[in-house]
């Protein structure tokens, strides 16, 4: 790590701590040349591989934009969308791979979105899963009702 003050090509780590709820590492460094201290924050880069094969950095903002479209006209606030985007990023990072197919990002959105707002979930799922008929919607609604019934039965 180059010193930002004197550009010396080496530095010594004085202290390391987790930051951003474990998503990053904050390191306090010291330059052996000029003696000044500086802080670095290290994060693992997460990339999304699109269907076309193009790779782009994971973007919470892009997740929020897509989900916001599905939530249009619904009572969903920005804090809930930010939390959902964080849950999606956590789920994708938990896969342990630096590159994740865009399909897996979509799958990671579905669960938290279903919990957040069922109508928005249906809108998102209809595009993501390419619904082509009313039967596709009916099948998804039936699955949602069955899951709700199972959850109610286990809560008793």
UniProtKB/Swiss-Prot annotation:
ZnF (unnamed) intervals: 3-34
BP terms from Gene Ontology: negative regulation of DNA-templated transcription
Residue ranges constituting the ATP-cone domain according to the UniProt record: 46-136
PROSITE patterns: ATP_CONE
One Gene Ontology term of the molecular function aspect: DNA binding
Cofactor remark: Binds 1 zinc ion.
Keyword Hydrolase among UniProt keywords: no
A Pfam family that the UniProt record links to this protein: Zn_ribbon_NrdR
Keywords attached to this entry: ATP-binding, DNA-binding, Metal-binding, Nucleotide-binding, Repressor, Transcription, Transcription regulation, Zinc, Zinc-finger
Cofactor dependence: Zn(2+)
Similarity field: Belongs to the NrdR family.
Role description: Negatively regulates transcription of bacterial ribonucleotide reductase nrd genes and operons by binding to NrdR-boxes.
Protein name, as recorded: Transcriptional repressor NrdR
């Amino acid at each position: 790590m180059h010193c930002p003050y004197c550009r010396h090509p080496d530095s010594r780590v004085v202290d390391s701590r987790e930051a951003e709820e474990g998503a990053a590492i904050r390191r306090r460094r010291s330059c052996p040349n000029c003696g000044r201290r500086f802080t670095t924050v290290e994060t693992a880069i997460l990339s999304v591989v699109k269907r076309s094969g193009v790779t782009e950095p994971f973007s919470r903002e892009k997740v929020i934009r897509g989900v916001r479209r599905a939530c249009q006209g619904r009572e969903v606030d920005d804090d809930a969308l930010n939390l959902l985007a964080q849950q999606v990023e956590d789920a994708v990072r938990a896969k342990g791979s630096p590159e994740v197919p865009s399909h897996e990002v979509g799958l990671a959105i579905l669960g938290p979105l279903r919990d957040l707002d069922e109508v928005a979930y249906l809108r998102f799922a209809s595009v993501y899963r390419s619904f082509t008929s009313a039967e596709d919607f009916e099948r998804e609604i039936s699955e949602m009702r069955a899951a709700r019934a199972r959850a109610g039965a286990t809560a008793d």
